[in-house]
Amino acid sequence: MEAESPCAASDLAVARRELLSGNHRELDPVGLRQTWLDLHESWLIDKADEIGIADASGFAIVGVGGLGRRELLPYSDLDVLLLHDGKPADILRPVADRLWYPLWDANIRLDHSVRTVSEALTIANSDLMAALGMLEARHIAGDQQLSFALIDGVRRQWRNGIRSRMGELVEMTYARWRRCGRIAQRAEPDLKLGRGGLRDVQLLDALALAQLIDRHGIGHTDLPAGSLDGAYRTLLDVRTELHRVSGRGRDHLLAQFADEISAALGFGDRFDLARTLSSAGRTIGYHAEAGLRTAANALPRRGISALVRRPKRRPLDEGVVEYAGEIVLARDAEPEHDPGLVLRVAAASADTGLPIGAATLSRLAASVPDLPTPWPQEALDDLLVVLSAGPTTVATIEALDRTGLWGRLLPEWEPIRDLPPRDVAHKWTVDRHVVETAVHAAPLATRVARPDLLALGALLHDIGKGRGTDHSVLGAELVIPVCTRLGLSPPDVRTLSKLVRHHLLLPITATRRDLNDPKTIEAVSEALGGDPQLLEVLHALSEADSKATGPGVWSDWKASLVDDLVRRCRMVMAGESLPQAEPTAPHYLSLAADHGVHVEISPRDGERIDAVIVAPDERGLVSKAAAVLALNSLRVHSASVNVHQGVAITEFVVSPLFGSPPAAELVRQQFVGALNGDVDVLGMLQKRDSDAASLVSARAGDVQAGVPVTRTAAPPRILWLDTAAPAKLILEVRAMDRAGLLALLAGALEGAGAGIVWAKVNTFGSTAADVFCVTVPAELDARAAVEQHLLEVLGASVDVVVDEPVGD
């Protein structure tokens, strides 16, 4: 019997078992990995010396995978490549056998291959996974020239070929993310392959080797959420402990091991571990997504594409542009002096579905001052746009949160950030849940009279969690200073406080109490102070909250019970007052006295402007006035229309999309031309919108693959309200706001033969709620004609067209 080799793998196996025994628990994960690496690397070096694998021998041992990265974990495969310079089989086979067989005999998991440098490069050129693995190759023993030829060759080949392989790399990454899910939102996450896992950092390393991203720069950037390298070390340490605790090469962190791993790493309990993993996974996931975009935009341009003009910068808001499929700062932006810029950038991202550029986020985080208290109305409106955008809200808030900007806007966010749910019915961490609630509330925006309160209620309804007390009670207290800081009026602050306090009231009562008992209905109505508007918003919030909790939480059965409860409560609450015309200032009444055309433009507090147009009333006046403002790139935030002694007084609160507002005399000239029929301002507005839509469609190909452009539009609603005067009706149109919407709605009413007696217009973030008091022709189908004209403007089938009598 042949004597055992001096470098027998049985000794290695004994040393491995000893290292993993309870005698070495003092080794932390870093120490365990280093000791484990030294153990195996020393064995390979000694074995190489024994079997003649030396410098200039024509053989080399190269480590790949964890061995190549110096991150060898217990129970992971030993990834080894035996390189040779073209040795014949009779020389090659004995050397390979003497290297592999001792490891096999010792039951050490081995992932091995035998290649020449040319063969290895050929495989790396055809197999993307093999290429990524070889990018991590490291010389262990033997002929250094062979190892360096492989390492240099595979990296040069990777750099030269990245342009043709980028599409496959992106597709493979997104397929893995879909298959393995996010680390941050999985009860048993895949630490290696999950979205935000270890493999994503290795992806970034590969992009850096292709010279497409600055890996060192992003790795050491210490954001409030933690650095990329710190997040990677966290996951690596947890995975190391998972191997040690489970005794297997696991990548999925099963719940049964969580408490022991938490104790070993000093995290407290499994909930603390889950919170730490969520933060690390989100940090890595953010950098991975940003890295893919940065790399795609940095790809070298060749052939015909090199002759094509670079993408244009498309203005979106003051200081904000779209460039190459990302939201970035305009060249003349001054973030150091513009505290509202963060939310304008965020609103543009949420509204378009385009991601915010990583460099833009870094610059904003480093230089933008905090918003004043209370917030300007413009900042609150931009926040509402973010919250009302639908699915794109998630990525926008995530980008702000990972870079510390969201926490500066809402310091109260910290206790719920990455907070794991205590209830198994919950799918998301608490912070993600409230964002998902806003996503589910967005399609319900036109179902309520105050979509702004719905959006803010969705964001803040669980703000009291994570503090060891009744989150509804504490949350109701917390939202008072929050909403005051945001600039809400005292009545709205009180309403939101009640909304948070009672956000569980409707579903709990509907599913646990007898709805036929009058005392049940009285108790709910009394808790809500008899406020039908609060009930309406709470109804929508209850639905959004349940849908955001998890699959099946909002069922048809539950919806029917809540609907029944709300119906019964409305019956016992006081009726809502009819909308009324806004009073007109005496100054404008005096202007109306001479029956001329007057235009006044004057600044308000902040960025907003009063634009008042006074002219003799005639059909089409309101639509033409609003169209002139829209054509001058003025965004209408609110408006009122009144007719006094045959003269229409239209008061608008507007803000310029870019730059300074137009001069009043210019607006007057354009308006007079529209009244005289010299200029078709409505036609110009419709053509501008059509051209803009075509431009967006044509540029869709510029958006990088894997960046979804998905926006949620709440279905429009038309509500008819009967008045005491039979000849007049009040009509409310709720729809997603867009440039020129007021002009188009007024034009539709006028085109249907309706006369506008007065109007009151409000925009809540991205949702418009426009009330018109109109006279309609006496024909039986007059309402239907009005609705049809409005439908054509709204561009969608109306969700609900209702007669809703409201009394005093």
From Swiss-Prot:
Gene Ontology terms: cellular component: peptidoglycan-based cell wall; plasma membrane
Catalytic activity: [protein-PII]-L-tyrosine + UTP = [protein-PII]-uridylyl-L-tyrosine + diphosphate; [protein-PII]-uridylyl-L-tyrosine + H2O = [protein-PII]-L-tyrosine + UMP + H(+)
Induction: Slightly up-regulated in a low ammonia medium.
InterPro entries xref list: ACT-like_dom_sf (IPR045865), ACT_dom (IPR002912), HD/PDEase_dom (IPR003607), HD_domain (IPR006674), NT_sf (IPR043519), PII_UdlTrfase/GS_AdlTrfase (IPR013546), UTase/UR (IPR010043)
Activity: how regulated: Uridylyltransferase (UTase) activity is inhibited by glutamine, while glutamine activates uridylyl-removing (UR) activity.
NCBIfam families documented for this protein: PRK03381.1, UTase_glnD
PANTHER family: BIFUNCTIONAL URIDYLYLTRANSFERASE/URIDYLYL-REMOVING ENZYME (PTHR47320), BIFUNCTIONAL URIDYLYLTRANSFERASE_URIDYLYL-REMOVING ENZYME (PTHR47320:SF1)
Name of the protein described by the UniProt record: Bifunctional uridylyltransferase/uridylyl-removing enzyme
Species in which this protein is naturally found: Mycobacterium tuberculosis (strain ATCC 25618 / H37Rv)
Gene name, Swiss-Prot/TrEMBL: glnD
